[in-house]
């Protein structure tokens, strides 16, 4: 059976996904055994596809800015898989920037 990652369907669910990214980084390996196929690939697939789902609500400019931050965050996590160089921390801080953008949209709607 193939693992199909959940795709966030709203701004609120995107905020939840960012919290998950912060907690599961930098390896995104499931320690519980419930999601053994979860990985950095599936985590960022979920986030990026969720951004596409919310594109109309976000607007093109915000959506692209969030995608750039997502790509930067992934690169930081990949460069520090053992959480020793500070890049993982920098990646986690990007989740806060993304949350600020998402919350600003949520307040307008």
Label each PLM-derived region with a short phrase.
Residues 1-40, 92-106:
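Short terminal alpha-helical segments
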Residues 20-69:
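Amphipathic alpha-helical interaction modules
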Residues 71-109:
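Amphipathic alpha-helical binding modules
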């Amino acid at each position: 059976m193939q693992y199909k990652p959940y795709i966030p369907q709203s701004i609120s669910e995107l905020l939840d996904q960012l919290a998950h990214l912060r907690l599961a980084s930098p390896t995104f390996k499931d320690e519980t055994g419930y999601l053994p196929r979860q990985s950095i690939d599936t985590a960022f697939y979920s986030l990026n596809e969720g951004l596409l789902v919310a594109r109309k609500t976000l607007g093109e400019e915000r959506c692209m800015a969030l995608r750039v931050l997502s790509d930067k965050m992934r690169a930081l996590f990949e460069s520090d898989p053992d959480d020793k160089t500070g890049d993982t921390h920098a990646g986690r801080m990007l989740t806060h920037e993304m949350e600020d953008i998402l919350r600003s949209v949520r307040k307008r709607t």
